[in-house]
Amino acid sequence: MNTKFSLQYGYTLFLLFFLPQHCIAASEENTDKYIEKYPYVYHLVQKELWDKALEDNSTYFPPTYSQDKFTHATANPDFLLTIGNHFYTQVKGEWRCLRMSVDSLSATGVKTIFEGTAPVGDKEADFEGTDSELFPHILGGIHPSAVLQVHMVSRDSEGRFLSVSDVVNTD
């Protein structure tokens, strides 16, 4: 293959990928506004995996962490059911929702940044509302001491997420 063509093609793809419409990142000012509006960070977790982290008092890492390089979360609780139903309906078992804050995560040495949506593993984040929302990306795992509250998650027999107790429901 022609090296000049290969480099030119690579640069073109790089430039297309980083067009402004493909990049939503939060400035420190925007992050502060987001945290003021949404003071908590929520993460949906398989109960079995969370129970293991609690039992061992160890840091939990989601199954896609090695691929994604961060732990997915949302600050806007209105997205919890959409996220669950988009990414996790095929994952069997009970689920929980962890409520944290940027400060509680920081106290365990974990930084949180607010960015545009990103795929979870191989599943694209192409659900409605993702083009204008910033999502907290937790740059590490979640230690039990960072969690302020654990919420029950209700699902139906098809795996659809119906509610997160004391946070959001489908009604």
Regions found by a protein language model. Give the residues of each.
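Bacterial N-terminal signal peptides that target proteins for export
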Residues: 2-11
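Compositionally biased, intrinsically disordered low-complexity segments enriched
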Residues: 10, 23-24, 74
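Bacterial N-terminal signal peptides
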Residues: 11-20
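Bacterial Sec-dependent signal peptides at the C-terminal "C-region" and cleavage site
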Residues: 20-29
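Conserved, structured core segments of small domains
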Residues: 28-171
